[in-house]
Amino acid sequence: MKTLTIALERLDRHAPFFMGTVAAPEGIEFNALEVGVGFDPGRRDGIDRHGRMFRDREFDICEQSLASYIMSRSRSDDFIATPVFPRRLFSQNCMFVNVDAEIEKPIDLVGKRVGVWSFQTTLCALAKGDLKAEYGVPWQEIEWHIQYHEELPWNADGVRSRTSPRARMPARCWSTASSTQCFIRCRRRRFSQIPSVPDACSPMRGRA
């Protein structure tokens, strides 16, 4: 019997792996590891899931960043992806604005300081594309404050960016003391008292 390690976030759609109810192919069994990313609270089997896979090839299978995967393939890394997408998010629901930043519509983000987990995070890549394609926002004219190290090195020529740990948003409210004026992050449940980018969500509602 061959055992394959599979590193996952403990999300509801991954529950069958942790409950042992996934039918593995004959001769194979899965060892599901609960591994978080970045500096999130530690999971049962640690953190830094993406880095441990890209850098150390620690797991047989790993829930991974699509954007970083595409970058790695462009550099001839020998990873193979399966067309399974456990997270399907609209970026518009994950953009939160400083209430004092005078941001009334997406185009107002031009010239503003926007905090992101990392520049190549899949949600950040999606958000940049949505801002440009849906609202005509040239994301190259935004000052990006990066909260965490990049999983893969990249060339930042022509992009205004800086590492800014202070870009991390507090869970309750946002004051002018924050180093950023907008933040893009997928953990929406923690920010119930922080408004999203005005007018950014409504055009996307109702889409499949």
Predicted segments — roles?
Residues 9-140, 144-153:
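Short, glycine-/small- and polar/acidic-enriched structural segments
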